[in-house]
Amino acid sequence: MDYEFLRDVTGGVKVRMSMGHEVVGHWFNEEVKDNLSLLDEVEQAARTVKGSERSWQRAGHEYTIWMDGEEVMIRANQLDFSGDEMEEGMSYYDEESLSLCGMEDFLRVVAAYREFVSKA
């Protein structure tokens, strides 16, 4: 899982992720932004579910993050609509609306994000 952190013209941090993990970047860009307390909450939840059968979920404005002891899933909240709402012959492209990654990989990105933000 490759990633890149950038600063926009206003100084805000933007995250770009490798193909297949774009939604993780969108989650950082839309849900986290400068809200490092959200990362505190996510890291605490990761410690709670790690090595257990439990899972944790937090719905944000645009994306929901879900994790269990081994993996993290981030999905766009818009995925909640049913296929019955689409016209016949149409399919919904959701490759950039759902990402799965390992817990350790995700926590490495969180740590790198914190480090990048702190160098402002």
Swiss-Prot record:
- Which Pfam family, giving just one, matches this sequence? UPF0231
Q: Which domain of life is it from?
A: Bacteria
Instruction: List the InterPro entries.
Output: UPF0231
Query: Record's family?
Result: Belongs to the UPF0231 family.
Q: What is the official name of this protein in its record?
A: UPF0231 protein YacL
